[in-house]
Amino acid sequence: MRLHTGIRAAAIIAATTLLAAGCTSGDDTTSSSPTGGSTEKAEKVDLTFWTWAPGMDDVVKAWNDANPDIQVTVNKQDGGDPAVTKLLTAIKAGSGAPDLMQTEYQKIPTLVAADALADISGAVDSSIAGHFADGTWQSVTLGGDAVYGIPQDSGPMEFYYREDIFTKYKLDVPTTWAEYADVATKLHEADPKAYLGTFSATDAGWFTGLTQQAGASWWGINGDAWSVDIDSAASQKVASYWGDLVEKGVIDNKPMYTPEWNAALNDGTQAGWVSAIWAPGVLAGNAADTQGKWKMAPMPQWNAGDNATGNWGGSATSVTSQSKNVEAATKFATWMNTSQDAVNILVAKGGLYPADLPGQAEALSAPPAFFPNQPDFYTTATDIAKSVQPFTYGPNVNVAFSAYNDQFGKAAESKKASAFLTALTAMQKATVDDLLNSGFTVDE
Amino acid sequence: MTATLAPTKPPTVVRTTTGATGPSNKRSTLSTVVLLVGAAYCLLPVAWVLVASTKSAGELFTTFTFTPSTHLWDNVQDLSAYRGGLFWRWMANTALYAGVGALLSVIVSAMAGFGLAKFSFAGKKAIFNVILAGVLVPGVVLAIPQYLLLAQVGLTNTYWSVLLPSIISPYGIYLARIYAAASVPDDVLEAARTDGAGEARIFARIAVPMMVPGLVTVFLFQFVAIWNNYMLPYIMLGNDRLFPITVGLSGLLNQGASQPAMYTAVITGALLSIIPLIALFLLLQRYWQVDLAAGAVKA
Amino acid sequence: MTVQTPPRARRRRSGRFAPYVYLAPAMTLFALFLALPIGYALYLSFRTVKVSGLGLGKGARTEVWAGFDNYARSLTDPDFIDSVIRVALYGLVLVPVMLGLALLFALLLDSKRTRGRGFSRVSIFLPYAVPAVIASLLWGFLYLPRVSPFYYVFDKIGWDAPDILSSQWVLFAIANIGLWGGVGFNMIVIYTALKAIPSELYEAARLDGATEVQIAWRIKIPVVTPSLILTFLFSMIATLQVFAEPMTLRPLTNTISSTWSPLMKVYRDAFTRDDIYSAAATSVIIALATFALSFGFLRLVQRRAFSQENS
């Protein structure tokens, strides 16, 4: 983005004056060596890496110790949506973006649309695709030839429950959603303060994963047009199911990740949690005293005997379009996410579920410390991970997700099953309107 | 918007004809109680942070809110150990942004306020009103354009990017103008000029000392404003070693779904970050006088 | 920044430039860091991005002129209109209560008959030192039934208290945070004005047997009216710009939408939807409305409480 000459001149004058005043500026974002290709091997390269995943300091330290020529600096960011805006603003401004960025899978189309990510297909080894499940690999290629990142972790969804409370009230672990509703009702009847779960209107990713399990895929590409299918039969099934449970009052309607929810995890009034593979870390942080009381089971299914799940969370490591060291950055990203050493650190220090299939066996040999009572935790999880259903994200996930917060917030507050369906329709409309307004071709 | 306001003369005293000469210094229990209730209301959340920061992560959600525990020191140590003492770096950054920013702001505001109060010149009213209009534009909106402009000169992700935009303060200029008008008598300036003192000398040796109490208020005001500003540093800074405390703590809270929010660290951090501010306030207690209107009488 | 000392002979002539020298740093900084970004935002408010095809890859997005489209969309957006109404209500709740309490506390501080004045003054002013984001986090803990001491007490005395974050009450929950953070500052402003009243003024009334309430009502309040008006004005502007409190409380409840206040809508458009263009248009509307309200209000009260300065 270019500014008018006058504005630039004024700004430059200001800057010159200030620099003359003799203050040192902060660390520069990117390396000063603009050279690409083979000549840079001899020179030292400094890379910056924006991330908020845990354990990154440890894995980067291991890399830096072994690679004096390519030094990586971790800059820990806020994990919220604004981190993406921050990157996009830097892209618009033409400077200020890091070399590497943690990119959640659902944000990749948005970032690619804003030309924020570098296509690293020329810098990666062609065999790398074999390290990942097809679905995971597709989320960094968007189905094309380009490669917009190296997958780091994924979040296949599972059902977590308090084994002690289930035993106490003689509840069976639900294998279908119909059973889940029964168990929720029984539990709430046995202890009116207890719930088997909550419908969280602040976690769009969670709801997306639930619809993914039911067979929804909210976006699609049709030639040169996008299609939006948020208000599909599959999503409607999920929305009205949860709306019904909330209306009956057997499921809570308060958001997750609040101090209130933490307290409920601690005192056992949230006796179950439909979550993802990274749940042990969250539970350990929020309710450390309940260690060993939780168990993990496959998601309840829509039809008995089915074997399907969705994804909640997970991200890749991408190289930004402003990086002057794409090759070095790609080298680091590849090592971090596909070498056994790095994957071991990611699991041990970060508690991530690595996307790298060959590295899983060794890295996941022991169950999470929070689940000493479930030695086969990762064996079960790896089986579940194979049943993640396909799903396509579009270029305005942020719009859809913010519409989810607002619309389902209203619905959850009203405690009416019908309001959940209305919310879904409103989400669909907001998403399509936004695409049309930006000039996208939308296949309706 | 105009602030060239002057109050009317105080109304004449209304004499009452009630005969009783009431004992004026009798203590009133009611007014004491009302004021103490107000004080309690204001202290309650602060007391809460104090108690909460003594709890371990588990206790925070399991024990009664106002039951103190013994983990304050552990919490401080954990927070200090976070990423190699990054928290203290954020504290130092905040002190730099708010301290240096407010100090520069005071100098700039004092000059401008003095100029506006003690001189009459073409465009005075227009300049003042334009500066005041700056109050109307919310900072959330300005952060992105400010970023795009600073990026043109390569100043983003530096201390400058937060410091420079923080220096200009319409409120500060407004207050400084009032203090200059109220506290610096015209005849003193005239006498100094007759003695041949230059403008720099008049400002530094005569005007500033007279304005000091007011300028301390401007300093406090701007210090808190910069301290409070979240959006500007958030968007300007990519390097977490340059973050101020607000941006840093908010990052600990927004860790994404797959991470537990670090409530204990955030609460301990909030407590530690408020302490210097409270100390500053107590230290400068006698300067707490925000005179928004009175000075304009003489302007 | 140093101001050149003019030679004696040129003293009178230099006087003409002196005010501009004093104003130069402020004006330069103002131009660079406020006027220029405002102008840039204004420019952006008339622009928009158009995408071609799937919008993926280089060159798929171009910035084009949008005319008044962004403005029209903002003004007809029901979410925006709702947010304006909500904030008007919020202001109606908050500002009178905040200034009323600030005045009351200031009067009590000014009365020799009150005990514990030093302690109370410090305590009530203290919240001003707490950043809004942190204040909202603290109150958030105090609002959530399971972790709040209030609900614990209510529970013990058997009172079924309503959820303060439910849709009927959430406005008050947010206003309370604004009140907590703002009452002390306004109290200090009014207290400063009260201290400036010469004590003879009311000692005489006191000797004549006027009660403290009569003195407050007939002497003190009229004198601090100009301060009250300005605190009202600044509180009104702050109300229109309310942002940090609802933003921080939002993840805790279903009842605060992403467009709860006008500024939250600006934030959502700019930071969540990456649409700086409509965010800019909405903020121009907010700034103009703030200006019109402030100006209108000053016009309204000026005749009553102020005499126009002629300079």
What name fits each language-model region?
Chain A
Residues 278-290, 303-406, 442-444:
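C-terminal lobe and pocket-closing loops
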Residues 65-132, 167-175, 264, 268-272, ...:
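Extracytoplasmic "Venus flytrap"/periplasmic binding protein-like
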Residues 105-157, 210-212, 295-297, 444:
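Hinge/lid segment of periplasmic solute-binding proteins
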Residues 146-152, 157, 178-228, 234, ...:
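Extracytoplasmic/periplasmic solute-binding protein
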Residues 89, 97-99, 127-165, 306-310, ...:
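A structural signal for short loop-to-beta-strand junctions that line the ligand-binding cleft
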Residues 167, 384-444:
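Conserved C-terminal helix/tail region of periplasmic/extracytoplasmic solute-binding proteins
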Residues 184-186, 225-255, 299:
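Glycine-centered hinge/linker elements that transmit conformational signals in sensory
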Residues 1-46, 65, 432-444:
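Short, low-complexity disordered leader/linker segments with a strong preference
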